């Protein structure tokens, strides 16, 4: 009987060991100890398991922290995509994400988050399995050679962990382009801009032909002295004229009145001794003249064209007495004067006594030079010579220096809107196309009857251009035909000042709409 009990115990033990072996084979991480012999091995195994659990718990905690961080980042990313719009596109964090991963940061963040969630689930399941193994290891009676009771049937296993997420799918097709938005309303007319700078000084014109010399006018009363003018531009230098023929010596003029005492001149060449004249009286000094202001020195002009010498003029009428001139340079020695008329013969005196021979007298002092004669009267102007041939056009002068821009004027108040305002426009391009006018709240065209370049110039002037050219066959317009038979001279400021039919009166169709081509 005892042997049978021993055999039964051996069979039970072997069955228990086989069951434990099968259980160990099913659990891949369970320590395989088929025959523990000492208590020290069990303690060592428990210590190893505890250390492993601690490390696993620490690793799971780190994974949880990383998952929480990624979830926080995911919430931040979701904020940018609420209602399919980027509400916070200008934030620094969004721009930083875009600069770091411009096309991949969203897909990579979502895939990494899914991978971490799967790893966290796997760690949680592994942790549960490890706890079950520890329970099996500590509660297994076969490990301590104790017959255990038959265990209750195990609970139904938990649902398996979610599988690893699949690879992200290919990007979807690009979205269709949205419909074009409605055209916005016309903006309000802005205030007029400030006044522009003054224009550049124009080029100097061509020199005109030399005019005929005018007759000498009567001497006018001297006007008040004007202010000193600014320095003028240098004139063109005319050509040097031919030397005139020397005039004949004029008749001896009447003796002039005694003039003021002149300044002492340089000693002239001694003339032949003349008859000793009587000593004249000293004249009274004249009043000093007003000192004139020196004029600004002009630039040297270019030589003018050679003129045709005119015939000698006739003797002119005596002019008014001129003001005393400044002292001139010393003149050349004058010709010897004509001998004076002999005096009347005196009575013959009685012969006087022979006187003593006197001493030779000293040489007398040189007499005071006589006053300068009055300047001869100016001859009358000669007959006008034949008109010279027009000279060649001079070279184009250098462009003048651009004047300084004036100070910006004060901005004027905005004017009130006028009633029945009229304006013009070009349909086609900015400066070429069909001419249209705005009248009574409606745009209309112009008939090309009598439409010429002068009309186009006035039309372009209304748009700020300076030149214009009339065009025809520029394409038919629509709506009203406001003007017909427009006839401008080209100097008008607007078309409304030109001769034309009344507004809306015409005999044309839109095939005859007028056009313009404007230029600066």
Swiss-Prot record:
N-glycosylated. Coiled coil: none annotated. It holds the Pfam family SRCR. Glycans are attached at residues 83, 136. Expressed in alveolar macrophages (at protein level). Detected in macrophages from various tissues including thymus, kidney, Kupffer cells of liver, and spleen. The keyword Repressor does not apply. It comes from the Eukaryota. Residues 147-419 form the Collagen-like domain. Residues 410-419 have a biased composition (Basic and acidic residues). Pattern recognition receptor (PRR) which binds Gram-positive and Gram-negative bacteria. Also plays a role in binding of unopsonized particles by alveolar macrophages. Binds to the secretoglobin SCGB3A2. This is Macrophage receptor MARCO.
């Amino acid at each position: 009987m005892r042997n049978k009990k021993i055999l039964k115990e051996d069979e039970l033990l072997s069955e228990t060991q086989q069951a434990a072996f099968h259980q160990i084979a099913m659990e891949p991480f369970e320590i395989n100890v088929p025959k523990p012999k000492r208590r020290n091995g069990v303690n060592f195994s428990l210590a190893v398991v505890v250390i492993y659990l601690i490390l696993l718990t620490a690793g799971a905690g780190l994974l949880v922290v990383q998952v929480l961080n990624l979830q926080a980042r995911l919430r931040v990313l979701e904020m940018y995509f609420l209602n399919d719009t980027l509400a916070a596109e200008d934030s620094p964090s969004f721009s930083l994400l875009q600069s770091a991963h411009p096309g991949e940061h969203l897909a990579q963040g979502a895939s990494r988050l899914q991978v971490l969630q799967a790893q966290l689930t796997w760690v949680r399941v592994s942790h549960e399995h490890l706890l079950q193994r520890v329970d099996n290891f500590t509660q297994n009676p076969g490990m301590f050679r104790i017959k255990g009771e038959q265990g209750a049937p195990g609970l139904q296993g938990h649902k398996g962990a979610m599988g690893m997420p699949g690879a992200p799918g290919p990007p979807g097709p690009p979205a269709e382009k949205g419909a074009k938005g409605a055209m916005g309303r016309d903006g309000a007319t802005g205030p007029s801009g400030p006044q522009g700078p003054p224009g550049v000084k124009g080029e100097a014109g061509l020199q005109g032909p030399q005019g005929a010399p005018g007759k000498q006018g009567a001497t006018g009363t001297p006007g008040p002295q004007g202010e000193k003018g600014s320095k003028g531009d240098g004139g063109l230098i005319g050509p040097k004229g031919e030397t005139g023929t020397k005039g004949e010596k004029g008749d001896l003029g009447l003796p002039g009145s005694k003039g003021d005492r002149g300044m002492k001149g340089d000693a002239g060449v001694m003339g032949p001794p003349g008859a000793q004249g009587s000593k004249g009286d000293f004249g009274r000094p004249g009043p000093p003249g007003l000192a004139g202001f020196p004029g600004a020195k002009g630039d040297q002009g270019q030589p003018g064209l050679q003129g045709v010498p005119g015939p000698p003029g006739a003797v002119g009428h005596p002019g008014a007495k001129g003001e005393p001139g400044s002292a001139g340079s010393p003149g050349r020695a004058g010709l010897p004067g004509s001998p004076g008329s002999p005096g009347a013969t005196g009575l013959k005196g009685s012969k006087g006594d022979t006187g003593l021979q006197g001493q030779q007298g000293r040489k007398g002092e040189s007499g005071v030079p006589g006053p300068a004669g009055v300047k001869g009267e100016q001859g009358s102007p000669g007959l006008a010579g034949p008109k010279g041939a027009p000279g060649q056009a001079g070279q184009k002068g250098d462009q003048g220096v651009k004047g300084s821009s004036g100070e910006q004027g004060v901005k004027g108040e905005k004017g009130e809107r006028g009633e029945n305002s009229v304006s013009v426009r070009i349909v086609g391009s900015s400066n070429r196309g069909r001419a249209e006018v705005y009248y009574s709240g409606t745009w209309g065209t112009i008939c090309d009857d009598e439409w010429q370049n002068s009309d186009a110039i006035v039309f372009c002037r209304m748009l700020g251009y300076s030149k214009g050219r009339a065009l025809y066959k520029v394409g038919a317009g629509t709506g009203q035909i406001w003007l017909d038979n427009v006839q401008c001279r080209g100097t008008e400021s607007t078309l409304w000042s030109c001769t034309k039919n009344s507004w809306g009166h015409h005999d044309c169709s839109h095939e005859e709409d007028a056009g313009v081509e404007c230029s600066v």
